């Protein structure tokens, strides 16, 4: 059933209808459309369009339809309705007859779809926040279990300084906490109701839009009808949050893919999140992580696409805005799936501590400690940096770590070096000295874990 037609003397070409219809994707707004219609029916009572008895009849029919949709959502796609609004109205008319045709009084699909989409966004943000916090908790638990797992930290993919696997986990907790904050911020701004703004100029009925917003669970009503039906900032904000969040998950995946390689060998992934090769029987591929990394691109694309769609649009509603949904739905679905999958990857991951320790002891990750030692002996840092560089070259030439060079060799580079240098060069000393807030010392890591646990409850 089309919601328009009196103006036209010819039927729409079937090819145009297929091109124009949006039911194949906006069917996902069915529950929100029904909930919004119930609230609108209540508002129509306050302005005398519906009697209380009529409203009760409509609400009962809409609630029955809501339960029917929840039980069998696939029925929507069996229809040839133009969009979800047409489908809901058609089903309502089937149930209550002519009374169903009164429901759209004073309402436009422009404010209707804007309301539906915001309600859907609120519901989905709630799911994303839950999944985000679950992943944070999984990372914190993994950190707690691996506080003593020393491994190399990297810059430029070169071994740099020793860290712990716990400290690595907590780095991603910080990123996810920012993702959580971005979602909460976006939720505050989208929590305003556009219902009652009509096509663009507002409704001709003196409806209390603040009351209407409250019925729908919004914090307040929007202040400008023209902006309200034109606004898709919430779509951009959520896509932006998703794009950033997926970058974090992609980096998480890339790190673990590297840690899982035979060359690094720091972790082993569970069989539950890996797959094999059809040819090479020895293979155990990190497919879950590779898919997380790969899916990041499609989310970035959704954000870029929506920015380009909106950038040249005049106010108010334009059919271009129908393109807001597919990218948003796909991006947030993808982000949610990847959050769940990342948590599953952590469930069963094995940290290979001996290999991590061995790698941390290689690559001269304690060179900075030797430079700091020289500074403590009164050598200017730039000079100390140069001295240690020369010592590293000699250690490489001899095929030894710095701590295995005899004192006589070390003193060739600086006479201030004494026997007290050797405890300084141990991995544990390297960790213990990083005791400022945010550092990798055992005390700081333990405090960070406790803080995260308290924040996450």
Swiss-Prot record:
GO biological process assignments: arginine biosynthetic process via ornithine; L-arginine biosynthetic process
- Where, subcellularly, is it found? Cytoplasm
Which InterPro entries does its entry note? Arg_succ_lyase_C, Argininosuccinate_lyase, Fumarase/histidase_N, Fumarate_lyase_CS, Fumarate_lyase_fam, Fumarate_lyase_N, L-Aspartase-like
Q: Which UniProt keywords apply?
A: Amino-acid biosynthesis, Arginine biosynthesis, Cytoplasm, Lyase
Alphabetized GO MF terms: argininosuccinate lyase activity
Q: Which reaction does it catalyse?
A: 2-(N(omega)-L-arginino)succinate = fumarate + L-arginine
**Chief site of localization:** cytoplasm
* Classification via PROSITE patterns: FUMARATE_LYASES
Q: List the disulfide bonds.
A: none
Sorted alphabetically, the Gene Ontology cellular component annotations on this record are: cytosol
E.C. number: 4.3.2.1
Pathway noted in the entry: Amino-acid biosynthesis; L-arginine biosynthesis; L-arginine from L-ornithine and carbamoyl phosphate: step 3/3
- The source's domain of life comes to Bacteria
Protein family according to the UniProt entry: Belongs to the lyase 1 family. Argininosuccinate lyase subfamily.
UniProt-recorded name of the protein:
Argininosuccinate lyase
Gene name? argH
């Amino acid at each position: 059933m089309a919601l328009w037609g009196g103006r036209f003397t010819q039927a729409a070409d079937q090819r145009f209808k297929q091109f124009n219809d949006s039911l194949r994707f906006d069917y996902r707004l069915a529950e929100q459309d029904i909930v919004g219609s119930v609230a609108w029916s209540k508002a129509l009572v306050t302005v005398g369009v519906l009697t209380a008895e009529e409203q009760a009849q409509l609400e009962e029919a809409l609630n029955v339809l809501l339960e029917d949709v929840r039980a069998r959502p696939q029925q929507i796609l069996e229809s040839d309705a133009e969009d979800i609004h047409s489908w809901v109205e058609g089903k309502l008319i089937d149930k209550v007859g002519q009374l169903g045709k009164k429901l759209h009084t004073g309402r436009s699909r422009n404010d209707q779809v804007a309301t539906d989409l915001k309600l859907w966004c609120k519901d989905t943000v709630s799911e994303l926040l839950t999944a985000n916090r679950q992943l944070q908790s999984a990372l914190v638990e993994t950190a707690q279990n691996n506080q003593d797992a020393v491994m190399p930290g990297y810059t430029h993919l070169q071994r740099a300084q020793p860290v712990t696997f716990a400290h690595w986990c907590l780095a991603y907790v910080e990123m996810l906490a920012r993702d959580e904050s971005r979602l909460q911020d976006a939720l505050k701004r989208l929590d305003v109701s556009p219902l009652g703004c009509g096509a663009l100029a507002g409704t001709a009925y003196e409806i209390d839009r603040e009351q209407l917003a409250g019925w729908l669970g919004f914090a307040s009503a929007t202040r400008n009808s023209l902006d309200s039906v034109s606004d898709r900032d919430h779509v951009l904000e959520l896509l932006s949050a998703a794009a950033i969040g997926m970058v974090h998950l992609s980096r998480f995946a890339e790190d673990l893919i590297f840690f899982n390689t035979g060359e690094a060998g720091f972790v082993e992934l569970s069989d539950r999140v890996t797959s094999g090769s059809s040819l090479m029987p020895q293979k155990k591929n990190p497919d879950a992580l590779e898919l997380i990394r790969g899916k990041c691109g499609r989310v970035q694309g959704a954000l870029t696409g929506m920015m380009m769609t909106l950038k040249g649009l005049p106010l108010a509603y334009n059919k271009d805005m129908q393109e807001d949904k597919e990218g948003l739905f796909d991006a947030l679905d993808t982000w949610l799936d990847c959050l769940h999958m990342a948590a599953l990857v952590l469930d069963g991951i094995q940290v290979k501590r001996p290999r991590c320790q061995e790698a941390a002891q290689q690559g001269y990750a304690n060179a900075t400690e030797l430079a700091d030692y020289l500074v403590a002996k009164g050598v200017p840092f730039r000079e100390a940096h140069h001295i240690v560089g020369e010592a590293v070259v000699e250690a490489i030439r001899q095929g030894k770590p710095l701590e295995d060079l005899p004192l006589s060799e070390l003193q060739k580079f600086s006479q201030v070096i004494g026997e007290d240098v050797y405890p300084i060069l141990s991995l544990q000393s390297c960790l213990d000295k990083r005791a400022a807030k945010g550092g990798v010392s055992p005390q700081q890591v333990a405090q960070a874990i406790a803080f995260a646990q308290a924040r996450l409850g």
